[in-house]
Curated annotation (Swiss-Prot):
Localisation: Cell inner membrane
GO molecular function: ABC-type glycerol-3-phosphate transporter activity; ATP binding; ATP hydrolysis activity
Enzyme Commission number(s): 7.6.2.10
Stored PANTHER family: MALTODEXTRIN IMPORT ATP-BINDING PROTEIN MSMX, SN-GLYCEROL-3-PHOSPHATE IMPORT ATP-BINDING PROTEIN UGPC
Official protein name in the record: sn-glycerol-3-phosphate import ATP-binding protein UgpC
Originating organism: Ralstonia nicotianae (strain ATCC BAA-1114 / GMI1000)
CDD domains xref list: ABC_MalK_N
Binding site residues for ATP: 36-43
Pfam family membership, one: TOBE_2
Gene3D superfamilies in UniProt: 2.40.50.100, Nucleic acid-binding proteins, P-loop containing nucleotide triphosphate hydrolases
NCBIfam families assigned: PRK11650.1
Membrane topology: Peripheral membrane protein
Family statement drawn from the similarity comment of this UniProt entry: Belongs to the ABC transporter superfamily. sn-glycerol-3-phosphate importer (TC 3.A.1.1.3) family.
PROSITE patterns registered for this protein in UniProt: ABC_TRANSPORTER_1, ABC_TRANSPORTER_2, UGPC
């Protein structure tokens, strides 16, 4: 195992910068997830760590070595790919053992390592099968087994679950979590799936357009998004973002102005103590933090357009002063399309963002 350091890592293609100065210190045994939409640079960053892409600027450290100029085989890493990359003519045993044979390890050590990894991954009864005789989940286990037997300093995972169906992804997430708990190998994992990121990560890096939006634990990122991008990307449904205005008067008040002519503005109350907002800002509120209430307690009303019942949860989709919002409901709530739903919310659950910079605005202590 080893620490992994990314220091001002950059990537250019034909003069176009696609990765912009990434900095991160990854501790020994830590599981880091890089999450973001397609095209944000996450796989490019992973491939630079692996040595499969040249680094335009900055440094990658594995342990106490700068590895920029080292070949992939010299970096002491093992990579698990999205498409499994198994040899179809080889058995499970031979696929897992192939890299060790190339390195010239003794047969006894190869056998011991493969059997140990097969035991961890419950592949012991499948060692003589060919990949075509395996399910998708079993093939992915073989790919992980091939990485485990190398006993690398760092594991690299490039969207390894994206080819699996939804039910199998849930199972494999649990198995990956348990695998890391047992091995405690430093791991860097790339995904576009926020659920994978939230469930697997010790810490997560949210990328957008080749830039770091936020680094933190899953709970930190969810509870205190650093930007409107993070607020809208992490969470399902995502955080509601509503434009508001600060109005002077008898104590500064916050209003949601109508999105269209004829929409009634909603007055949300006075500005919280210590919060200094620009004249125009964005208010964020997660669906589960909006509380349906009696009309005389409401700070605003949502015009309900659709109710989605999901069994354990229900969501009302509608408009607040003409702006789209989602409200999480009690699954037994008698709310229907066409209702005018009175809502309230705790000030502790409100988030504020600068619409110009898109960054979070914090209240002063």
């Amino acid at each position: 195992m080893a620490k992994l350091s990314l220091r001002n890592v950059q990537k250019h293609y034909a003069g176009l910068q696609v990765v912009h100065g990434i900095d991160m210190e990854i501790g020994d045994g830590e599981f880091i997830v890089i999450v973001g939409p397609s095209g944000c640079g996450k796989s490019t960053l992973l491939r630079m760590v692996a040595g499969l892409e040249a680094i335009t600027g900055g440094e990658v450290w594995i342990g106490d070595r700068v590895v920029n100029e080292l070949e992939p085989a010299e970096r002491d890493i093992a990579m698990v790919f999205q498409n499994y990359a198994l040899y179809p003519h080889m058995t499970v045993f031979d696929n897992m053992a192939y890299g060790l044979k190339i390195r010239g390890l003794p047969k006894s050590e190869i056998l011991a390592r493969v059997q140990q990894a097969a035991g961890i991954l419950e592949l012991g009864k499948l060692l003589e099968r060919k990949p075509r005789q395996l399910s998708g989940g079993q093939r992915q286990r073989v790919a992980m087994g091939r990485a485990i037997v190398r006993e690398p300093a760092v594991f690299l995972f490039d969207e390894p679950l994206s080819n699996l169906d939804a039910k199998l992804r849930v199972q494999m997430r649990l198995e990956l979590k348990e695998l890391h708990r047992r091995l405690r190998t430093t791991s860097l994992y790339v995904t576009h799936d926020q659920v994978e990121a939230m469930t697997l990560a010790d810490r997560m890096m949210v990328l957008s357009g080749g830039r770091v939006e936020q680094i933190g634990t899953p709970l930190e990122v969810y509870a205190r998004p650093a930007s409107t991008f993070v607020a809208g990307f992490i969470g399902s449904p995502p955080m509601n973002l509503v434009p508001v205005s600060r109005h002077a008067g008898e104590g500064a008040q916050i209003r949601v102005d109508g999105a269209q002519a004829g929409d009634a503005p909603a007055t949300l109350g006075h500005l919280p103590m210590g919060l200094h907002l620009p004249e125009h800002a964005l208010m964020g509120l997660r669906p589960e933090h909006i509380e349906p209430c009696a009309a005389d307690r409401a700070i605003a009303f949502v015009e309900v357009r659709l109710v989605e019942a999901l069994g354990a949860d229900a969501f009302a989709y509608g408009a607040l002063a003409g702006h789209p919002v989602v409200v999480r409901l009690d699954p037994h709530a008698s709310v229907k399309a066409g209702d005018r739903l009175p809502i309230t919310a705790s000030a502790d659950h409100l988030h504020w963002f600068d619409p110009q910079t898109t960054r979070r605005i914090e209240a002063l202590a």
